[in-house]
Structures are given as C-alpha cells and as structure tokens.
Amino acid sequence: MDITINPRLFYIMVFIPFFLISLAVHEFSHAYFAYRFGDNTAKNEGRLTLNPLKHLDLFGSIIIPAISLLSGFAVIGWAKPVPVNHHNFKNPVRDDIIVSTAGPISNLMLAVLFSILLNYLPSESRLINYLYMPFIFNIFLFYFNLLPIPPLDGSHVLNHLLPPHLKPIFISISRYSLIILMLLIYSPLWKYFLSLIEWTSNLLFAP
C-alpha cells in the first residue's frame, strides 16, 4: 500500500520541533544568566532546563502557532516567561539588562547556526526548505523580543536606560502594550521591521 504524506503537513511536522527548541533555548538563556547572577527563582521552578515542555504556554506555544501554521501565515508564538527577581542580583541594573538580552541573543546564535548549515548544503538539497523557516524564525525572535514594548525583553533594557522621571510614564503605558504592538504591526513601520529581518537573513544566507 502506497502511503503519501501531504508536503505541507510534513513541513509543519519538521518545523514544530525546531520551533519549540528555539523557544526553550530563549527561556533557558534567561534562566541560566539569572542563576549565574544570584537569582534562583527560575531554577527553583524547574525552568533552568532546555526541555521545551517546561517552557510551554498553552496559548502562545500551541494554539496560536498551530493556527498560524495551518492558515499559512507567518508563525507567531511565545513561551511561558521565566520568572526573574532582579532584587537577588548583585548589580541589579547591569545583571537585569544582561539577563533580558540573553534570550534574544541566543536566538541570533541559533540563526547563525542554521545559516552555517544552510550555506554548507548543496543548493539543490531539499533540507534547505525545512531549515530556512526556523532560520528566519530565530532572526524574527531576536529582533521582535528587542522591541521596547512591555513585556518584551527590550522593554526591560529601556526601563533601565530611561531617566527616573520618565520611568513612571513608561510603566503606566505597559497596560496598553498589546494595543501598541497591534498598531505597530498594522502600521507602515512594520515593513521596516520586516526589511530588517530580510536584510539580516540575506547577510547570513544568500540562496
């Protein structure tokens, strides 16, 4: 009996493990550096691990990604945020900035790793089709998480860099962060964000 698998379904099945690993590496990086700087919160909650199951968020890691994949849209998703108590840090400002940027930087490192694999593969290799999406996804995670919109990692960095008199204003607008993010996505500015992802992907890998 001949069994054929829908190419799109197979593509999704291949991508899902890369998707979950990318999210797990991101959250593990936050947990690891927080632990190194004296905060055991994530470790005590079992988050100092690369096991994707420990970082899953039902809505952000399963439902939304599944809908976007099945609909043919760009993959959107997130993991359960790692709990961090910056009061446990020896140098709260410096350490929190490093912990916050560790996640996005880990995704950039994964993108570089994927680019090395892609560049070494023969141009006719079918593996390129399956590795290219996690490659792009990790570039997206790198830039997206650096956006200075709460609760994204970039907002932690900006909060530490703002003058004291502006911090209360920044904190007060955090309740509108989802609205701000949606306005950004549907604004003309979003095309510049996507252009940045395209520029980075072409820099690392030119098919």
Q: PLM features: residue spans?
A:
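Hydrophobic transmembrane alpha-helices and their immediate loop junctions
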Residues: 1-207
